[in-house]
Each structure stands twice: as C-alpha cells, then as structure tokens.
Amino acid sequence: MVMASLSAQIRGNNIIVTVEPDRQDWTYKTGETAQFVVEVRKSGTLLDNVSIDLAAGPEMYQDVKKTMVLKDGTLKLTGSMKQPGFYRVDVTAHVDGQDYKGACGAAFSPEKLQPSTVMPADFSEFWQNAIAEARKTDLNPTKRLLPERCTKDVNVYEVSFQNIQPNYRTYAILCVPVKEGRYPALLRVPGAGVRPYGGDVWTASQGAITLEIGIHGIPVTMEQKVYDDVFNGALMGYWEFNMDDRDKHYYKRVVIGCIRALDYIAEYTPWNGNELGVSGSSQGGFLTLATAALDKRITYYAPVHAALCDHTNSLRGIACGWPHYFMKMKSESEFAQSCPTPSDPMDCSLPGSPVHGIFQARVLE
C-alpha cells in the first residue's frame, strides 16, 4: 500500500502540456478558423504563471513565434490557412528548469492537396531498365538458421542475396512457419538509420512468411555498437549520397533491393504465389509505395507516415517529406540556378532529371 501510494504521488507530479483544437476530427476547410486551447497542468491542476514558447503556423513554416507567461496556465489562439495543408501549434513549457512539450496539427482541406513533383517522361523506362539490368545478376542466396530466435511455430534465418550487381548483397531476417505448406508473404522495409533486425516472428506465427530487410549491404545480426559506428561514420547522411546522379543515388540500389527481395521470396520460400505484401514506416513508407508501384506482384501494401515524398513542395514554401532536400533553397528560381545549364544532359529542369526521376512510381491501380 505504501509503494502504491508513493507511485501515485510521483505520477501525480507530472507536468502535462496539451494543445487541442475545437473539432474532434481536427479537420477544417480552407478559409475557416481553427481554435486551439493550450493547457499546462501539474498534478491535474492548471499551473499558474508558467513560461512558454509558442510556435504556430503552416507545417514546417510556422510564422508565429512568441515567448509568454500564462497567468492561469491556459491560452486560446486561432489559426487559418488559405491553401490546403496542415496548421501546427507547438508549445514548450519551462517548469523548474525542465522543458515540457505539447503539439497539435489541424488539417485544412487535406483532400485537395496536390503533388508538386512532375512525372518524368522516361520514368517507366528508367526503372524497367534498372530492374532488368539488376536481374542479370543471380541472387546467389545464403541462409543461416538462428536457433536462439526460433520458436515451436517459426523458423528464423539470416539470409542474403545479391542485389544490383555481383557481390553487393542485401541482408535480411526470414521467418517461415514450421508447418509444411504454402503461405502468404510480407516484405518489411526499414525506416531511416542503421540497425540490426529481429524479424517479424509474430506475423509468421500467424501463418505468413516474413522477410525483414536491411538496406545498407551489411549483415543485420551484429551488435548495436557496430551499426552506431557505421551510422556516425561511413553512412552518416547516406540519404544525400550522390543525389545529383540518378544512377549512383543511394536509394536507387535500395529500391532495386526491395524488388530483388520479392524475387527472393518468389524463388526461395514457400510463398503461395498469390498474396504478397509490403509495409514500412517513414523511409520504409516510401519504400512501401515504391515497391508496390514498381512490382505488380504486390497485392497489398501498408505505408505508414511515408517519407521521401514531394520534395519540390519546399520550393513553393509548402511542407515536404523528409529529408527535405531543397529546404535551404528559397525558391524554384534558386533551385534552377543550382542546376547545370540546359545543354547539359543532367539538366535538373528536364523530365528525366535525377531529382525527379529517382522518387517516382507508377500510379497504383
């Protein structure tokens, strides 16, 4: 009883910052006004004379920034947008030398959002050729049982296969139901970073083959420190490697690796030949969309908060996807000035330019 009481007291001392809109679905039409209520509470009670930093405005382009003291721990404010998009409110409260944060985003006519990126004329040709060229390299797979990860229902392996060229390999964790049979399959694609992978054992236990891939061409069962060292060293900022050359851009081989992973599933696992899915979040959300768009074997896909989308939006002062390639450029004219001259075959204004050509996909039917 004493421990329970003490625990309750500790939890009751928590500082909580909330930001809430005046609509339950957080959705408005352009031109309408959203009302937000900010509250800073301690032990469930509004905190008097609390200092806060406030930032509000369009996502990634907040134009209201203030520091103020909330006498009664609460604040009401309004926001509106003339263009479809998202309005964000961020609040940081300063209490006893500590910072406590709250945030809220409201959507304005989100169904009317339009992409800024233009489909390159040679997009389909570029990717079809790249995939065909990669398939000239045999998968030449390897497979190693991981007994410490196996369960009574699932066998777990570290596998690898050649990707875009000989000796460049993709490593992954393969989970296969123990029971003999043909199964649906799920490709899991990763968010940004460098890390080991455990495999999706649970989904496999429910009767599906799962293949969780890494994208960096290194084994996925080493100690975490190895990945930290690589991420802070050779692979720091890998998402920007060779971004001016669509044939050498880091994500070209990553996307091709996803397609080769499907090839591996089709050829080397007891896949049923019918149900094939792909899923991932952030960077993995992008890879989910790209894989589903480029390979018609995919029958279901589940992207979660996809990154790497609509990069050129930032040239119009509108929120774009991570990693915000052009955020430091103020306008489309500045972007054009940074590109080669029109006579250059790598001219960024041409339909098949690298900045447009690497992150597109066929329309999903």
Where are these regions (language model features)?
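Cap/lid segment of the alpha/beta-hydrolase catalytic domain
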Residues: 195-259, 264, 312-322
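Proline/serine/threonine-rich low-complexity linkers at boundaries of modular beta-sandwich domains
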Residues: 9-17
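Hydrolase active-site cap/lid region
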Residues: 285-334
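Short beta-strand element of the alpha/beta-hydrolase
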Residues: 172-174, 182-192
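Surface-exposed, short loops/turns at beta-strand junctions within beta-sandwich domains
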Residues: 80-85
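Low-complexity, Pro/Ser/Thr- and charge-rich linker/hinge segments at domain boundaries
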Residues: 108-142
